[in-house]
Amino acid sequence: MKSSRRSFIKKTTAIGAAASLSSLPFSLLGKTQNNPIKIGIIGLDTSHSPAFTKLFNAENPKPELAGFRVVAAYPYGSKTIQSSMDRIPGYIEQVKELGVEIVDSIETLVQKVDVVLLETNDGKPHLEQARAVFKAKKPVFIDKPVAGSFSDALKIYKEAEAAGVPMFSSSSLRYQKNVHAVRHENKIGKVLACDAFSPATLEPSHPDLFWYGIHGVEILFTAMGPGCESVTRFSTPDSELVVGTWKDGRIGTFRGMRSGKHDYGGTAFGTDGNLFFGPFEGYEPLAIQIADFFRTKKSPIDPQETLEIYAFMEAADESKRRGGVKVRLDSILLS
């Protein structure tokens, strides 16, 4: 099992870009507003679904979002998390008003669309839902959390690769202006450290940080890049502090706030200064990345980095269970 997992994780450039234009049953080239790339949504139990629909189905969308239209949606969605289930009827009505057809199964959905947004707020059914999309050979964006466990996240990426289906997953916080600038525009020179924070409310059915902590952890990894070697976790009744040590000796921290009203952000420290992240800037920057992914079928994020993010969170849980001892990420990635 270790050798199988190790060989998969090393093949980072192949995942998400395995399928060529000619191998898919449609072309994403030359699409216009009159002949758009048809998007299907799985899961109307999250505010992300109507938010993305409004962006793509706008009368005059941003140029980067032009040539797409959300045409169909399968509402479910969590059937066990009450706070998610209760939102489904209202979000059904919202997307119907934007011209979206509601369908009764994922199998029906994939027959009507070119690409898929897997938006189900509950990460537990993502593996089963993604398998139906992979079978249909449709490029797919999977919203956070990519799955309800690291094990399922790894299976999703491996099965996407085996099926030759492009996919990627991300929190919208990765694409805040300053976060993106630190990573891609050398805004503060080499990043020496980062302190990130976000709400970290709990959902008992998910590993601790997977539910909302993912947002702040994704900020941390966007700034620091991959290569975290170990984590140590410290807990109080009101917050969680996870200290990560990178292979080059740099230190990055994530602070998750359990209660109260807290924003998403952090501070990155570089050789040319420091930069503050936050507040949340909405879903449009992520939608633009999704649109580019649907056109090119190339993930903007190395799959190994996404898997490392989930290994970081699972290692943080293990550290907490063991009273705050240091836990190596490779004990998760290669177990």
Regions found by a protein language model. Name each.
Residues S49, A153, V179, G216-V217, ...:
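A general structural signal for well-ordered alpha-helical segments in protein cores
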Residues D104, I142, M167-S169:
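Hydrophobic residues in well-ordered beta-strands that form the structural core
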Residues K137-P139, K144-P145:
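Short helix/strand-capping hinge loops at secondary-structure junctions
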Residues G265-S335:
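C-terminal active-site/capping subdomain that shapes the small-molecule cofactor and substrate pocket
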